[in-house]
Amino acid sequence: MSEATALSPAEFEQALRAKGAYYHIYHPFHVAMYEGRATREQIQGWVANRFYYQVNIPLKDAAILANCPDREIRREWIQRLLDHDGAPGEDGGIEAWLRLGEAVGLDPDQLRSQELVLPGVRFAVDAYVNFARRANWQEAASSSLTELFAPQIHQSRLDSWPQHYPWIDPTGYEYFRTRLGQARRDVEHGLAITLQHYTTYEGQQRMLEILQFKLDILWSMLDAMSMAYELNRPPYHSVTDQKVWHKGITP
């Protein structure tokens, strides 16, 4: 049996970009936020749960750095970690997200406590970090390519939220504005790594599955939020109205 022919770099990039059809910008929960149909509680719930994603992104990037023997790659990839954690004496994306939380009426200490993080969101994010730790560095780096679609989602929030949610302090939108440029820069680097590393048909198909895995994570996070904040079915809703789910267990 002859081996399947590998896609050309242009064809492979096209296949990667086609995965954008499954990006979470199309999830009903996100569509409702974009169209102005989200309640204050739903916006706050989204911000609180996405904070768990934000604080774990540097852990994901640190895992990639730890597994990568290529100094030139590390020199460029480390900027992602600084973008979120902040350089010495400077705020990063995590502080910007805390300001977004304040802008929608959440207390920063409550965000930091992660007490509002739903189990489904926690499990999805943890799966992403664990993948980055266990996979080879090229696969972990390539899993970040949902950034191909990120500028569109950040711009959609900047375009629609000020119009639909005047109660949100506009200073909270700093994170989205900053990420517009950062995401475009990160895409160029991540895409170059991916196109260079995956040169066989089997490897390219595996990479498409890895990208789908990351898309599954983002979609599943919104599924959990939709259950809790749209359908009013948070975990254990049938037996208690208390937030009894675990708040994170340190090994």
Curated annotation (Swiss-Prot):
Pathway it works in: Cofactor biosynthesis; pyrroloquinoline quinone biosynthesis
Keyword field contains Transmembrane helix: no
Coiled-coil features, chain-numbered ranges: none
Top-level taxon of origin: Bacteria
Signal peptide interval: none
Organism annotation: Pseudomonas syringae pv. tomato (strain ATCC BAA-871 / DC3000)
Catalytic activity, as annotated: 6-(2-amino-2-carboxyethyl)-7,8-dioxo-1,2,3,4,7,8-hexahydroquinoline-2,4-dicarboxylate + 3 O2 = pyrroloquinoline quinone + 2 H2O2 + 2 H2O + H(+)
Function, as annotated: Ring cyclization and eight-electron oxidation of 3a-(2-amino-2-carboxyethyl)-4,5-dioxo-4,5,6,7,8,9-hexahydroquinoline-7,9-dicarboxylic-acid to PQQ.
Gene Ontology biological-process entries: pyrroloquinoline quinone biosynthetic process; sulfur compound metabolic process
Keywords tagged on the record: Oxidoreductase, PQQ biosynthesis
EC number: 1.3.3.11
Enzyme class: oxidoreductase
CDD domains: TenA_PqqC
Entry protein name: Pyrroloquinoline-quinone synthase
